[in-house]
């Protein structure tokens, strides 16, 4: 019985790609929130690669396919997988972000709509990313010119996505897009469509606003006031490993080490044993 249930949870990813060097390594990452972990590697032989996995407990794995080769952009292909799905990946060049994913998974089909909407621009964006990677030793002026070009392309893609999002119902993929747009608003000076993004954010119900993505979007759209030297430190409900709540105000007058880190930060995780000793 267990073999049958295992087979029912299994999905396959079959790749057929042209214009890619034989012997190129491909890695499959499983994304959990902001953290990605490698769950498989394969080598492209005669233009093919293959992965087989059991879906996680949530019933939907969010994956990304990546090649670290210098012919490739430092980007990855987004894949959504569910139990029993037979997924086919095809490409004609190393522009991996726009390789085609033929899949029965609803989230994948929705994601594909966004890609197709800006395929020409994404291809150009990837070519620039490859060029920028090979220009590490170039002058700052040349690199800045490339970045300005990338920012302009990115801004047009964002505007196209905004237009598409107005027509689509809210879903997980839609929320991911809104999060990406809110980050662009924060970091890309060429992207200035704040009113339109706020209008999309206003479509969210309370539960969606309270989700992890919803909270991140809110912080990007309404940046919190930063604390200056000499001000009272910003405070919040901080939970220890036993789930007990603490506040920074409880430690007033004492020395304190605050370690800020990103959820998927490798060096931070490696430093944990030392932090515990302190």
Kindly label every feature range from the protein language model.
Residues 252-277:
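Conserved redox-active cysteine motifs that mediate thiol-disulfide chemistry
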Residues 1-7:
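Hydrophobic h-region of N-terminal signal peptides that target proteins for export
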């Amino acid at each position: 019985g267990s073999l049958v249930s295992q087979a029912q949870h299994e999905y396959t990813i079959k790749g057929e790609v042209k214009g890619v060097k034989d012997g190129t390594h491909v890695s499959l990452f499983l994304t959990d929130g902001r953290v990605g972990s490698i769950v498989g590697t394969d080598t492209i032989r005669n233009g093919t690669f293959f992965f087989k996995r059991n879906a996680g407990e949530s019933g939907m794995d969010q994956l990304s396919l990546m090649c670290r080769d210098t012919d490739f952009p430092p980007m990855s292909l987004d894949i959504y997988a569910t139990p029993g799905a037979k997924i086919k990946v095809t490409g004609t060049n190393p522009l991996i972000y726009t390789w085609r994913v033929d899949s029965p998974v609803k989230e994948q089909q929705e994601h594909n709509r966004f890609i197709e909407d800006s395929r020409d621009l994404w291809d150009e964006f990837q070519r620039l990313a490859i060029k920028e990677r090979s220009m590490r030793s170039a002058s700052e002026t040349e690199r800045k010119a490339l970045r300005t070009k990338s920012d302009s392309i990115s801004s047009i893609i964002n505007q196209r996505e905004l237009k598409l999002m107005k027509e689509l119902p809210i879903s997980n993929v839609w929320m991911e897009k809104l999060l990406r747009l809110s980050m662009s608003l924060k970091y890309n000076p060429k992207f200035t469509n704040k009113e339109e993004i706020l209008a999309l954010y206003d479509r969210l119900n309370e539960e969606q606003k309270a989700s992890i993505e919803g909270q991140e979007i809110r912080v990007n759209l309404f940046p919190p006031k930063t604390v200056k030297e000499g001000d009272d430190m910003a405070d919040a409900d901080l939970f220890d490993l036993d789930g007990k709540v603490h506040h920074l105000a409880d430690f007033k007058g004492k020395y304190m080490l605050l370690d800020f880190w990103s959820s998927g930060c490798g060096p931070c995780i490696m430093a944990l044993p030392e932090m515990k000793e302190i």
